[in-house]
Structure formats: structure tokens, C-alpha cells
């Protein structure tokens, strides 16, 4: 049986539920979207393509909510589903998501194994050969990421990763020469080549390759590749070439603003701010950092906020604006209280207080009253009213106690002060006021509230064997096994099902460790 067709009628109810979940996610209602997706899996479907898509969205919403282990688990479910039905493009995308998530979680060996597995999967299947170029590019990217993150402390192992990357790039070039269908973009190849040369400390060759990539991308109107090439060229240049680094970052920001994503613009502004600070261009660095901070809060890109706050604080100290710097130092200290970077913020408050002491008369107390005026979104009254005293910066342990005190004070409920000579409230006025308010609420409901209602499942709540093996699968498992599937993937799924009887009920604990993470799609070579 051709698995591109499914046994049974099209599952219109599950599709309607999925559209409802996606709508909620697009409105920023991620918890609601997550709940709707869980309802779909509880409802169940026999449409394998649809179920793979459901897994993909569930993984994405978990990733957004920082439920990393659960996101990784469902990206693996997604990959298994698409590999079962020989959907090679989706299998490539699923593997890329798994690799990105695994690298985010610091699981380099897992990312590498999945990338290698994709090469095996595509090269051993007749209809998958045209996707092997994408698989090799992904594997090369993983090797470079591992080399860049110093996951291998042994220099010989790092050299081995670079050698593997070079081999994969050469294989992709050969693939492109012999295949027009599925050929990998030349700009992707050149970007990887240039990065490989940079990490191998062949800087002159790397610069030439990046420039070649930029010229080719402009000529072929691939402007997204232009800003990536400029950024990478700056990122991997020798650290003493500040003038050229800043120039390339400006070019990257220019092209990203016109042709890139908002996330790219934030990343480039953050990096440009750091390098301009290093070059002594304090005020311009401060302005770029402040712009990046506003965008970070708007887009929820919290992975950048600590670095940006630290850069802004350093710029303000260099400009002699210590009261304003203290505000950003406290913000950063609160955010990084349990992280290694907390010490970096302590070092800055120590610098600021020492400067303040040198400019304060001996008969006066050394202190800094917080000035939050540069922050357009400042609304934290607890921090705004705080005064940093010299004793607070005695050492990092003392500063940690002070910051923990601020955090504890923020958690306390705000006391409502009773106004003096306050007249008693007239009961009839209160009733009319509440009635009018309710009328306004009934007539001015926001459009976002009118999301399509969640369809109610009429399916049995009993968990079937198929549902335990793949959450949301409602099918006769004996009949499913008779269909034309990828046998190796099927065997892996069945093997795992014997080890775990987990079903959708296990998703109640969304942040638990994925104990099955290394035993999902591995194949023996």
C-alpha cells in the first residue's frame, strides 16, 4: 500500500483542531496553543502526515516555553513519523530541529548522531538520494558547531571535526556536479567553507572565501546570505582587526534590516555594540545596545538580554553616568543571580562604586541613587528607588545577598495605603459604577477572544497500544503494521515501546529529562 494515502476518511476534526491551535500560537497564546495540541493528541488521528505536523507544532511550542526536554522528545516523534512514511523533505527539516534543540541543550553527541543518521537514511533509500546533499550540509554544520564550542578538549579531535567537515563539503560539491535535482545552494557551501577555514585559523583564505560568497550572493539576489556572510566574516576575524570587524558588522546590520529577520537585527546590534565598546566608541555602542534591548523585550529573545545589559552598563560607566549604569547592573544581576555571568555584573558595580568613592568628599557617604531614565520601559519601582551603598560592593558574596534581598522584596505584595479623610463609598454609586463597567466589557471584547472554539472529542478515552507508542495515533496497530513503512524506523519504535508505556498522560510533567533521548533513531553502520 502506498503510504502517501491513508486508510480511512480524512480527519477533518483533527485538522480543525490543529488550525485552532496554530491560531492561538500566532496570537502569542502559547500555553493555550499547547493545551489545544494536547487535546488533538487525546482526540487522536489515523492520518500519519497530519500527526507528524502536530508533533512539529507541539515541539515548537514547548521550545518557546523552554520545556526543552519535551520539545526534543516530540521533534523525535515528528522525525519517526515522517521517516515511517518516506517523507524525505520533512525528515530533513525534523532532523534539523532535533539538531538545533540538542545543541541548545548542550547535547553535541546526540546532535552529531542524528545528523549522521540522516545521511544513512537518505543514502540508503532510492527516493531519498536527492536529499543527501542537505543531510551532508547539516552534518558539516554540526561538526563546525562542535569545534566552535570546544566540545572536544583534545586538539587532535578538533582537527578531526574540521577534517570531517571538509570531507562533507567536498562530497556535497561532487553531488551538485552530478545532480541538478536536490542540489545544495552555492552560498551555503561557501559559508561553510569560509567558517571551516576560520576555525582552522586560515584567516586570509577565510576572508577571501567570505568575500567571494558576498559577491556571488549579491549577484544572484540572495541578500539573506549577504548579511550572514558579513556577520560571520566579522565574528571569525582576528580580534585585533577591530576597524574591519565593525565595518563588516555595520554591513551585516544594513542588509539584515532590509532583508533579514528581526532576530538577526537584534543579534547584529548586540554584537556591534560589544565591538564598538571595545573600540572606545562608547556613546554609539550604548545607543545600539539600548535599541537591541528594546527589541529583545518586544520579541522575547531572552538569550541576548544578559550580554546587552552588561554592554550598556559598561558604556555608561565609561561615559561617567554611574547612576544610570547602576540601574542596568542591578537588572542584569537580578536576571543572572544563579548564572556564572553574575560575577561580571558584580565587577561592574565594583568599578562604579570605586569611581564614585574617588569623586566623593571624605566626610560624605559613598552611594549611588538609581537613575532609570534611559530605559523607556522601566516600571520596576523597587529597583528605581534603590540606593547602592559602598558596603554593598565589598565582595561578590555581599552583592549576591543584596540582589537576593531585592528579589525577595519584589515578591512581597504591595500594601494598599488608606488615604486620609477618605469619604465612605456610597453603595448605590458602587452598584451603578459596576453595572456600567460590565456593559463596557460586554461590548468591547478584543478580537483575539473570538478564536474558533475547541472541537470536543468523541473518541474513546481509552489509551490504545498505538497511542502509547506514538501519542495521538488512533489506529488498529495490527493493520498499521501491514502497511508499507520504513522497516528500520518501525523496528526502532516498537523496540522503544517495550521500554516505555508512556502516553499523552506523561505530558503533564513537561520539564522532565528525556531519558530515552539517545535511543530513538540510531542506526548501525
Swiss-Prot record:
Keywords: Cell cycle, Cell division, Cytoplasm, Cytoskeleton, Mitosis
Cellular component aspect of the GO annotation: aster; cell cortex; mitotic spindle
Keyword Cell division recorded: yes
GO BP terms in the entry: cell division; establishment of mitotic spindle localization; mitotic spindle elongation; nuclear migration; regulation of G protein-coupled receptor signaling pathway
Keyword Cell cycle: yes
GoLoco domain residues: 424-445
InterPro entries given in the database record: GoLoco_motif, TPR-like_helical_dom_sf
Disrupted-gene phenotype: Simultaneous RNAi-mediated knockdown of both gpr-1 and gpr-2 causes, in the 1-cell embryo, a decrease in nuclear and spindle movements during prophase, reduced asymmetric spindle elongation during anaphase and mispositioning of nuclei after cell division.
Any one GO MF annotation of this record: G-protein alpha-subunit binding
Protein origin, superkingdom: Eukaryota
Span list, region Disordered: 488-525
Main location: cytoplasm
Localization of this protein: Cytoplasm, Cell cortex; Cytoplasm, Cytoskeleton, Spindle
Function: In the 1-cell embryo, probably together with gpr-2, controls nuclear rotation and spindle elongation during mitosis. Complex of gpr-1 and gpr-2, in association with lin-5, activates G-protein signaling to affect mitotic spindle force. Polarity determinants (par genes) may regulate lin-5/gpr-1/gpr-2/goa-1 locally to create the asymmetric forces that drive spindle movement.
Subunit composition and interactions: Interacts with gpr-1, lin-5 and GDP-bound goa-1.
Protein name according to UniProt: G-protein regulator 1
Biological source species: Caenorhabditis elegans
Gene symbol of the encoding locus: gpr-1
